[in-house]
Amino acid sequence: MKRLLYRWFSSFSAFQYRLDRRCTRAGSLALGILGAAVVIGLDTNRTVGYQVFTLVLALVILSAASSLVFRGRFAARRILPRFASAGVPMTYRVAIANHTRRRQAGLVLLDELTDPRPSFEEFVTAREPGEERRNWFDRQVGYPRWAWLVSQKRGAVIPPRPLPPLDAVGETEVTVEITPLRRGHLRFRGVTLARPDPLGLVQALKSIALPQSLLVLPKRYPMAEIRIAGTRKYQPGGVALASTVGDSEEFVSLRDYRAGDPMRRIHWKSFARVGRPVVKEYLDEFFVRHALVLDTFTSQVGDPVFEEAVSVAASIAISMQTQESLLDLMFVGPEAYCFTAGRGVAHTEQLLEVLACVGPCRDKPFRALHHAVLDRHDALSGCVCVLLGWDDARQELVRHLEALGTPTRVLIVGRRETLDRLALPGHVHRLEVGRIAEGLACL
């Protein structure tokens, strides 16, 4: 039964998509009038319904027939920026080349994304937020869940772009507006040139395959830098890490060579003067290193709380000054990850790229993140934890960090009703979904 419903929903969505592309606004209105005329025509005493139905049907058939043939040869080139940001409108350029010897006018550019329909496994296993509050029929049939999944997988809104007249064997470049709806890779499938028929009801289409992708960064909120008490810590990466982050070791003195000393530390002038190997001695390197810990442990697909937590982590990452310190982004996906930025190791922008693609972890316990953080606590000057709850496992992580003397800031992201039920300590900051910006402004 579930598979039959899935096939019906999928076929209906495909039909609706093709109909929306084929019909102009006037064409959609004509179809609506056609349907209304059918309903009115059920009363055989009202001949006006038959007359309207016949007239509109004839117009639609003529328009559809005239749009069957679209002779034209075109090429397209899409010029995308490096990044976009979720929820922020932006523009990009598309170049259209007319390879025919006729001037083409009245065309409309439709830029197409990949198919947003979910797979059967996603349809069966996913749960729409608040689905338990729907009526029995909606829960069993699942169409609201289908519509929600399609909206979650639809990457952006791209309105049709009317084109200026295309000269024969010429090229025209236009700007297209797009509003990314979610973070992650936005995948384009191709572009379609639509030509309305003389009645303006139905469009003839000419599709051009043009696969491309654009990385959409998470939504960010304005906020001040989070101040974390902490001291410079010894970094066990040695000379290689110290030179990478820009802190060369401090020269102390010269001493006789010992077995195992690297050749690059030999002081050649002293070697030539005294006749035996002499090396330069340095102090160990210390600098500030903070951790940004992101809780990815949620079972829901497209969980808005998780998406807001990712946005909070992105906002914190860009607010922290990494010119004089390191920032480790830590989370658990298929495995435990730690990405470092600052002091020449990497730019904060690269952390945003990572956050654009991070997904929820459903097959590992929270303790996996606990161990990953504690394995690096010796090198940490401070820690910021962005959590999705306040259960025993998460409280244990915070207590363990505080017991080890690591200054820790804790941010809990959740819905208001969920946060109200939690007994949060005074040092734990709550961030309500829908009021994230206000919560971050209070930090």
Question: What feature does the model see in each segment?
Answer:
Residues 6, 39, 223, 260, ...:
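Intrinsically disordered, low-complexity regions
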Residues 31, 57, 250, 264, ...:
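Alpha-helical structural motif
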Residues 1-77:
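Extracellular/lumenal glycan-associated context and N-glycosylation machinery
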Residues 48-49, 57-339, 382-386, 400:
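An amphipathic, basic-hydrophobic helix/alpha-beta surface used to engage anionic
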Residues 318-443:
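Acidic, glycine-rich A-domain
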Residues 12, 16-19, 271, 312, ...:
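Generic hydrophobic, helix-prone segments enriched in Leu/Val/Ile
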